[in-house]
Regions:
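A beta-strand signature from Gram-negative outer-membrane beta-barrel systems
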Residues: 1-36, 133, 138-140, 153, ...
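Short Pro/Gly-enriched beta-strand edge/turn motifs at strand-loop
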Residues: 2, 121-128
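Transmembrane beta-barrel domains of outer membrane proteins
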Residues: 2, 23-25, 144-148, 157, ...
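Short, glycine-/polar-rich solvent-exposed loops and beta-turns at beta-strand/coil boundaries
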Residues: 11-16, 170-173, 207-209
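Membrane-embedded beta-strand positions in outer-membrane beta-barrel channels/transporters
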Residues: 19-21, 140-142, 176-178, 282-283
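Surface-exposed loop/interface segments of Gram-negative outer-membrane beta-barrel transport/assembly proteins
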Residues: 29-124, 165-168, 176, 180-281
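Outer-membrane beta-barrel transmembrane strands
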Residues: 134-152, 159-161, 268-283
Length: 283
């Protein structure tokens, strides 16, 4: 810390309140080589819990009510026939030609009273938000070697950081190297060289609120009765020739329900990366 005349002599009026000089790590004179290793492991998660959402049963009942009210406005329907038509059209309106989440046993899962049929239960409940999140582990490793003799001091360090984000295919990696060597060549001549290098890679999915590729918005928007994977009528997964599950892109979904879209399937393919190399030196 430089204060008063010392700071004024170097920095003028800008140093009137004092100057703090930050120096990089360096080796100690007349010291044996010291090796330090530091490893940390941690994780991160969402600090604020997401909104509560309606489940499949309540969603179907509310949508039935909306259909019934829509039909009841028309002179072609009485209150009773509007309720009957709403029950008939409910699955088609929500699922198009896709699978009925209540199975073939319940072609009309909501009755004319607007209540779920007795015994009806969803055969699946897809958690789109969970499918687009990952374990956000943070790993950091640092190694340093320092020491020196009467005339020379040295400090070398290397570091690695891998910080995964909570969103699928998001994260940050960094590799860094640093060296600081000081040599007293004569009683009146002293030299030093300080070099550093850092290589970083950042992966980040699109985060604009208006885009369906926003993992947070998409997870909140997609109801659980739209399956992530193709389903059989009994609620089991359809499998390909290798026995793997098949992503459901929802070509049957009605307009406004993100037809032909499956972000958990496409996120690993839609790379959004930023790489940066930084080199600096000082003598």
């Amino acid at each position: 810390v430089l204060k008063d005349a010392a700071s004024a002599a170097l920095y003028g009026s800008r140093g009137a309140n004092g100057v703090i000089i930050i120096t990089t790590k360096q080796g100690q004179q007349d010291s044996k080589a010291t090796v330090k290793v530091k490893a940390t492991l941690g994780g991160s998660s969402r600090a604020v819990r997401d909104y509560d959402r309606v489940n499949t049963n309540l969603y179907f009942e509310l949508y039935w009510e909306a259909l019934r009210n829509q039909y009841a406005k028309s002179s072609d329907y009485t209150p009773a026939t509007a309720a009957t038509q709403a029950s008939k059209d409910l699955v088609t309106k929500l699922m198009g030609g896709g699978p009925n989440p209540y199975g073939t046993q319940y072609p009309q899962p909501v009755g004319t009273d607007g209540k779920l049929a007795a015994g009806a239960r969803p055969l699946w409940n897809s958690d789109w938000s969970d499918a687009m999140e990952q374990q956000a582990l943070r790993t950091e490793l640092n190694l340093s070697v320092s020491g020196g003799g009467k005339a020379n001091q040295y400090f070398f360090s290397a570091g690695y950081l891998n910080d995964k984000g909570i969103a699928l295919e998001s994260g940050y990696q960094r590799f860094n190297l640093r060296s600081n060597v000081t040599s007293e060549m004569t009683s009146w001549l002293k030299g030093s060289i300080n070099l550093s290098f850092a290589h970083s890679m950042q992966n980040y999915p699109v985060s604009s609120d208006s885009k369906t590729s926003n993992v947070i918005t998409a997870g909140r928007t997609m109801p659980g009765f739209y399956p992530i994977y193709e389903m059989n009528t009994d609620g089991s997964y359809k499998l390909d020739d290798n026995g793997d599950r098949i992503y459901d892109f929802g070509s049957y979904r009605p307009s406004g329900s993100m037809a032909n879209w499956n972000l958990p399937a496409t996120l690993p393919l839609d790379k959004s990366e930023r790489m940066k190399d930084e080199v600096s030196g000082r003598t």
